[in-house]
A protein has these predicted regions:
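Glycosyltransferase catalytic domains, chiefly GT-A lineage
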Residues: 1-161
Length: 161
């Protein structure tokens, strides 16, 4: 059954895998609230990876904290090429696909600063997807630092066929 986009539960979400991004995540939440959004703002946290004090600060700012299992990329060669071995845990953001209680989620990296309303990302139909486009000197590539889509546990199966 299709959900009604005007009444369905939707949210903005971010992910933290270390304490070092807590200031950015707090800034992201504050910048979203400054736009006047009425939508839920949630924070996914890698299970067992953040300090108690970091979690307490997040609980005061976000509407909901969701613990997700940490995932690590086994692609050490490409992480080394990027010079960013710390990005290995960014695949943990795939945990948003499990949040099927939401009809739509707009995922934003924790170091994002929102300067104006982006509520329209949550108003799109469930058949639409928005991905931030990142321009690089070697050509364009998609940046999953901004992703708006409808969670669906069956979605990853597309890649297995």
């Amino acid at each position: 059954m299709a959900s009604n986009p005007t009444t369905a539960r939707v949210c903005f979400a971010t992910l933290l895998t270390t304490d070092s991004y807590v200031p950015g995540a707090l800034t992201l939440a504050a910048s979203l609230r400054a736009t006047g959004t009425s939508h839920e703002i949630i924070c996914l946290v890698a299970d067992g990876q953040l300090s108690r004090s970091a979690l307490e600060r997040l609980e005061l700012t976000f509407d909901r904290i969701v613990c997700v299992p940490i995932l690590q990329s086994a692609d050490t060669a490409n992480l080394a090429l990027l010079g960013r071995p710390d990005l290995g845990s960014t695949v943990t953001k795939i945990g948003i696909w499990n949040l099927t209680e939401y009809a739509r989620i707009a995922f934003l990296d924790a170091d994002t600063l929102v300067l104006g309303s982006i509520d329209s990302l949550l108003d799109m139909s469930n058949n639409d997807m928005a991905i931030g486009h990142d321009i690089r000197p070697n050509g364009g590539m998609e940046n999953a630092g901004l992703l708006a889509a409808a969670p669906d546990l069956g979605w990853p199966d597309m890649f297995n066929s």
